Structure formats: structure tokens, C-alpha cells
Amino acid sequence: MKAAVITKDHTIEVKDTKLRPLKYGEALLEMEYCGVCHTDLHVKNGDFGDETGRITGHEGIGIVKQVGEGVTSLKVGDRASVAWFFKGCGHCEYCVSGNETLCRNVENAGYTVDGAMAEECIVVADYSVKVPDGLDPAVASSITCAGVTTYKAVKVSQIQPGQWLAIYGLGGLGNLALQYAKNVFNAKVIAIDVNDEQLAFAKELGADMVINPKNEDAAKIIQEKVGGAHATVVTAVAKSAFNSAVEAIRAGGRVVAVGLPPEKMDLSIPRLVLDGIEVLGSLVGTREDLKEAFQFAAEGKVKPKVTKRKVEEINQIFDEMEHGKFTGRMVVDFTHH
């Protein structure tokens, strides 16, 4: 089968490879689509260690082709997912308390185990979430990562209907955060991005206010116009966005961090204490979060913007990603092989 494999010089080689036989509790998916995520870029570039030889990809949707011994949660013919959260240990304090993505022995698709950017992929059946009927698999691929990540982040922000949520970064993650915030949580949304194209798209999606921080001070405007945001979700990978988010929040507000810039953020301790501000990290989502995120997409409340590409274009896609050359998500199409 054809697979996108990480090489030692930090590129991707599309080559023929064979998967091992299924073990107890596993299923084999015939892949339909696999989205390309910024995390794949980090893994490919060796930012998390040398992963030479690993099949990349963790935004996969496929049809169950075969199930191993002991599988009860999936059957042949089901459409199911391959996500970054590939499996947890199942018995630690995090796994048993609904915080499974924080499991210290977690496996991640396309990083610690072979991923979904291939014609076939092995999953642990109990950790592979079924896709609801009527949800386009290309669209579903974006929900497995970008969708569930932003849905969970908005959930963690504890935003209430009619409250102001400021979203920093309106790329592949941010535009979905905006849709979940508006169409599921019924919040008022402020979109902040340095790219006017992304802001125009945010406006189309129903943003109540858009700000380009290159031209104006986002935090100052948010404080002046609405008295500060009730919560902020930061998907941008710039330290300046995190610092602005803290300044843009009102007393008692929450800053939810999603993007991963390498630097440290500045945090005024008196502001934190005297204004009772919370700063929280939110990492992807649990299986239950993904099930909910899929359902809202199936109901048409969230529509990821996806562009289908061939697996042979994978290095070009990563190059475009590094230079911020596209809006929405790029999805590799395996349905025509």
C-alpha cells in the first residue's frame, strides 16, 4: 500500500509499505481522507525528536476493512476516525477521570505510532470514533483534529450564550473555533488575525467584530468596545497573541491556550490575582468530545473549509503551510487510488 513516510532529511517520501497483522482489539481501516495539520509539520521537521520511517498523519477517516479478535465497538463497513489521541493506557488518574488526553503513556498517531496518511491504517478499535451518517468524510477528517481541538477549547472557556469570546488566529483551527462558538455555544465572537483574508472569511462565518493587530491594538479595542472579553481562545502561534489575550480579558475571564509558540508568555501576577483571571491549556479532545464535535458537524452547524489534494503533493502542502499560503484545511484524498 502507498504511505507518506518521514525521511531522515525531514521530507516525506510516498512509498509502498506493508502493515503488520492485526493484534487483539485492533481494526484495519481503508483510508478515504487524511487532513494535514501543523503538528505533522513539527513531527516531520524533527521538532519532537527523530521520527524517521514513521507514517505521518492524524486526521484520518476510513472504512473498517477488517477487525481483530476481541473487537466489539467497530464492525466491517463502519466509517471511523484516526486521531492524534490514538490511545491512552485506560487506567491512570487521567484516563479514568475524563481527561484521557493527558495520559502520561499516550500514543499519538503519526508520531509514536504509524498514522493515517496511507491507503490503510491500523487503529485500536475502542479509541476510533464512528463518523455519523450524512457527514462528508473529507469534512469529518478536519473534525478529528482541528474540529475537536477547537470545540474542546471553546468548551473549556466556559463561554455562555451572548458573552464575548475573542479568538486569536483564524486559520485552520480558528475558523472552526469561531463556528463552534457562534453556532453551538451562541457566543458573540471577536476575530483577531494579522491576515486580512482570514478576517474576511471570519466575517463571512459570522464574526461580530474583526481586528487586525498589525494596524490597531486588539486588547485596547476589546476593552473599550465591550469592556473586555469573557474568554479568549488563542490558536495563533505567536507570543504576542497570548500576551494580548491576557490584556483583552475582563475580570474573572479565562484565557485558553491552544497554539504552541516556543516562547514563554508574559503574565502580570497582580493582574492575575486582582482580576481573578484563569489561564488554561487545552489539548485536542477526548473520544466523547470528538463524538460531540462530529455530531454538530453532521447537523451542519460547523462546516470546515477543505481542499482535496493528492498524496504526491504532500511536500508541497507542507511548504505552503510553512509560508501560510492557504485558508482552511488541506485534505489528502485516498478515494481514487
Curated annotation (Swiss-Prot):
Entries under CDD domains matching the protein:
CAD3
**What influences the activity of this protein, per its activity regulation comment?**
Inhibited by ethanol.
Gene3D superfamilies, alphabetized: Medium-chain alcohol dehydrogenases, catalytic domain, NAD(P)-binding Rossmann-like Domain
Residue numbers binding Zn(2+) 1: 37, 58, 145
EC number, UniProt record: 1.1.1.1
Q: Which cofactor does it need?
A: Zn(2+)
- What Pfam families does UniProt report for this protein, alphabetically? ADH_N, ADH_zinc_N
InterPro entries xref list: ADH-like_C, ADH-like_N, ADH_Zn_CS, GroES-like_sf, NAD(P)-bd_dom_sf, PKS_ER
Which domain of life, per UniProt? Bacteria
Tell me how the cofactor is bound. Binds 2 Zn(2+) ions per subunit.
Q: Care to name a GO molecular-function term for this sequence?
A: alcohol dehydrogenase (NAD+) activity
Residues binding Zn(2+) 2 are: 89, 92, 95, 103
Catalysed reaction, written as an equation = a primary alcohol + NAD(+) = an aldehyde + NADH + H(+); a secondary alcohol + NAD(+) = a ketone + NADH + H(+)
Keyword Chloroplast recorded: no
- Output the PANTHER family linked to this UniProt entry: ALCOHOL DEHYDROGENASE 1-RELATED (PTHR42940), VACUOLAR PROTEIN SORTING-ASSOCIATED PROTEIN 11 (PTHR42940:SF8)
Summarize subunit and interaction data from the UniProt record for this chain: Multimeric (with different ratios of monomers).
User: What other note does the entry give for this protein?
Assistant: In Z.mobilis there are two isozymes of alcohol dehydrogenase.
Name listed for the protein in its UniProt record: Alcohol dehydrogenase 1
Q: What is the lineage of its organism?
A: Bacteria, Pseudomonadati, Pseudomonadota, Alphaproteobacteria, Sphingomonadales
